[in-house]
């Protein structure tokens, strides 16, 4: 079971989409960033940089992880799906596109929320 701490942002949505695709059981806790809930003491224990999304993997000794890219890689490797670590070229090509999305495409989607 994964506990997902998130809000309705592009980065937050990425994780729930992957959890659904991988058919991993999860529970969502909304962290309302418009009300500064990301600065609560309880959330800081999960995400020390005050950012969403973050997860707690209850099946792995309550392992915590923040940053969408790190979470996506963790979930893909945890299930053995989507990342083919047996083929290093394919593995790194996938990571290359993930990093491109995180550095270039993702921020543009996030900026669009400022005007809403």
Predicted regions and their residues:
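GST-like domain detector, emphasizing the conserved glutathione-binding G-site
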Residues: 1-113
């Amino acid at each position: 079971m994964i506990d997902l701490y998130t809000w309705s942002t592009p980065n937050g949505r990425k994780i729930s989409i992957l959890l659904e695709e991988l058919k991993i059981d999860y529970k969502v806790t909304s962290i309302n960033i418009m009300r500064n809930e990301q600065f609560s003491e309880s959330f800081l224990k999960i995400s020390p940089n005050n950012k969403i999304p973050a997860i707690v993997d209850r099946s792995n000794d309550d392992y915590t992880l923040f940053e969408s890219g790190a979470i996506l890689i963790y979930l893909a490797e945890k299930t053995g799906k989507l990342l083919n670590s047996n083929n290093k070229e394919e593995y790194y090509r996938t990571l290359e596109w993930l990093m491109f999305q995180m550095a270039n495409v993702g921020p543009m989607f996030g900026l669009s929320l400022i005007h809403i």
